[in-house]
Regions:
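Membrane-embedded alpha-helical signal segments
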Residues: 4-82
Length: 82
């Protein structure tokens, strides 16, 4: 699994805990609903290698491939501990 610093970069890139409304995943994508898209920082998100970021309003999808379920669990765990 990815280290805590990489996972924190994803959280920070999404605008921090206070900007994240929900986290889910499909087969290959981390699906996140955020409050304010202006707080999105793709450079920070890209510190954890991915295959692309899809943005539609407040819905963000980050393509991680088959490891996405592990990444989702790591993001949720880190959010709970903040």
């Amino acid at each position: 699994m990815k280290n805590a610093a990489e996972v924190q970069c994803v959280i920070d890139g999404l605008g921090g805990k206070e900007n994240i409304l929900s986290v889910d995943n499909c087969f290959t994508r981390l699906r996140v609903n955020i409050k304010d898209p202006a707080k999105l920082n793709e450079e920070s998100i890209n510190r954890l290698p991915n295959s692309g970021i899809v943005k539609k309003g407040t819905d963000i999808q980050i393509v991680y491939g088959l490891q996405v379920a592990d990444i989702k669990r790591a993001v949720e765990a880190q959010l709970e501990n903040q």
